[in-house]
């Protein structure tokens, strides 16, 4: 088994850490600015609460280390051995943990405490098991360091999960547990296979062998009473990883979570702007329809010459915080109508305005009504197009 000679060697990349830490701070500041634009105070407060938690985590939070794997892989036993304390719930059928539990430990050489999170197992065949699995995957994605526990060779789904966690830039230590139930050659063969499967990844993945709960087997030489857990190599790997890269891993995790929160905040703002914009569009649809009903005018001429359309553009631009002059608004209206005409949208809308309708008084009234409705429809098309333009 490969062992590192220097456990607490300082290999920190200070420049990289500063860049990641700075990016995380900037991202959190950006979230705060976005939240100020949200008119719904309850939503804004909730998002600010989450933002403040991330800020606190970045400054003084613990390193979050999550145990992740199948229910029978021995995650809780590993946590128990690492903490030297009995934790978790027992179950004769599937796994030992039915809920997410966390345990804090202090290592003097580290800058922060370690928060070890023991999660429910994967692959539990039930609806409740599926819900637990989703919660477990979320916990892993929000961790600084993931201990991916296996008790046998890696399967396709586990390999898929490793790929997904690596896409999120997670640091993973693969823990090959229950090594006392296999020969040394079998363990080494499994380890080599895991390394070969994961070696194509850009991120380096460590593989550590453990015995969380020793069992009497043909491969153990000691008496059952003298068997002791072997998790020392895992403990050293965790400490070395956090000592060398813990600050960068934590900052990277906060950056990832802050970006997710920022997307959530932006979606709230976009939803709010869309509702406000629709009110503006509806207002000008009624104004346009009413004016044309009283004073018939070809719809295209109305859209390109009236100040009503330009005023709608100005109001929509304010909602999306885009500064436009009246000349900009007029140029934008002309350009947009030209683009819509090329796509045949105006032609299709105006096709219903038949001159033949104006041959009698009844048809004149009907003609005015159709012009009014059509102009309102065109205003809505223009308005929705402007929303997409300003949004992007």
Question: Which residues does each PLM region occupy?
Answer:
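Conserved C-terminal guanine-recognition region of P-loop GTPase G domains, centered on the G4
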Residues: 107-110, 134-207
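Flexible beta-alpha connector loops of hexameric P-loop NTPases
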Residues: 122-129, 181
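Active-site helix-to-loop segments that bind/position phosphate- or nucleotide-bearing substrates
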Residues: 246-276, 280
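Hydrophobic alpha-helical transmembrane segments and adjacent short intramembrane/lumenal linkers
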Residues: 318-353
